[in-house]
């Protein structure tokens, strides 16, 4: 077991932001994060990017964000306080088209569970009504505006990296579209500095052996959300996805639990469920993650 940690965060909600209308569990309080990083620092962890984790002594904690919510900018104060370089794995479609994330729109407007991997994200975006596109256009749910992202990406602690253009999980029938998703995403990122073009975060954390082989032929590191630690030489980095303490318990406890056999097995079962074409269709009648 490796002591190095790679954390996956999605949203940060300041007291000034409106209440979330979807996926409340993803919104982390800044104060809880500051307490977590102070605790990790006191335990001897140093903060670094995964690609720089071999340098220096002691265990490493790496911090990543997925998707591109504009509220990611709230993390800069914490990052500066603790000297934390971090990665934002960005979905470019939402910034380019200025539309909130489809899974939030779905949860806010429909009763059916979010289908995760059995639908075309691009087609869903194209089918949105004007009202659906603006329903969640608040500082809580919206993506970065282009000018905001440009300013954010210029910060020396910020590094952008690809996460797919529309966030389409690259499994089942959508594996054949992987090249298009990646090319559009990387082309969009060319305009920014400090882009980690050799790092890729799997949309929804879903993967198969075939996809893994294909991605490792193109990227140096790919990132899951399977939990546990990592070694600096790992090319598949299993991140720990943190949720609001009201849903998952204290953040430090969530990290410890991610190393447990039960947690890892549950994540593998979930990955199998949504990566398999037949099972992903059946998942429409279950509970989406």
Segments predicted by a language model, with ranges:
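C-terminal active-site subregion of NodB/CE4 polysaccharide deacetylases
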Residues: 1-64, 70, 172-289
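Generic enzyme active-site microenvironment
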Residues: 64-65, 161
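Metal-dependent polysaccharide deacetylase catalytic core of the NodB/CE4 family, i.e.
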Residues: 4-16, 23, 80-206
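Short acidic active-site motifs
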Residues: 73-74, 148, 211
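A short, Lys/Arg-enriched amphipathic alpha-helix followed by its capping loop at the start of a domain
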Residues: 35-43, 78-82, 157
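A structural preference for long, well-packed, hydrophobic secondary-structure segments
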Residues: 32, 51-53, 57-62, 69-76, ...
């Amino acid at each position: 077991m490796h002591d190095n940690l790679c954390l996956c965060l999605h949203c940060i909600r300041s007291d000034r932001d409106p209440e979330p209308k979807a996926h409340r569990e993803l919104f982390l309080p800044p104060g809880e994060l500051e307490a977590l990083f102070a605790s990790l620092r006191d335990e001897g962890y140093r903060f670094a990017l995964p690609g720089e984790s071999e340098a220096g002594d002691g265990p490493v904690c790496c911090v990543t964000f997925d998707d591109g919510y504009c509220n990611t900018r709230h993390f800069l104060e914490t990052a500066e306080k603790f000297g934390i370089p971090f990665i934002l794995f960005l979905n470019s479609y939402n910034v380019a088209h200025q539309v909130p994330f489809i899974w939030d729109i779905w949860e806010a407007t429909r009763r059916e569970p979010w289908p995760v991997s059995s639908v075309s994200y691009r087609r869903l975006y194209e089918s949105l009504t004007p009202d659906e596109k603006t329903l969640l256009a608040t500082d809580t749910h919206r993506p970065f505006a282009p000018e905001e992202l440009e300013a954010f990406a210029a910060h020396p602690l910020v590094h952008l990296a690809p996460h797919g253009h529309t966030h389409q999980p690259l499994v089942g029938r959508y594996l054949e579209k992987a090249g298009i998703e990646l090319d559009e995403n990387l082309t969009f990122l060319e305009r920014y500095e400090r882009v980690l073009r050799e790092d890729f975060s799997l949309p929804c954390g879903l993967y198969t052996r075939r996809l893994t082989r294909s991605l490792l032929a193109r990227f140096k590191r790919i990132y899951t959300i399977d939990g546990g630690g990592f070694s600096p030489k790992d090319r598949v980095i299993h991140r720990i996805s943190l949720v609001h303490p009201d849903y998952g318990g204290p953040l430090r406890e969530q990290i410890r639990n991610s190393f447990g056999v039960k947690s890892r097995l549950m994540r593998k079962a979930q990955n199998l469920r949504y990566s398999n074409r037949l099972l992903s269709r059946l998942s429409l009648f279950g509970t989406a993650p």
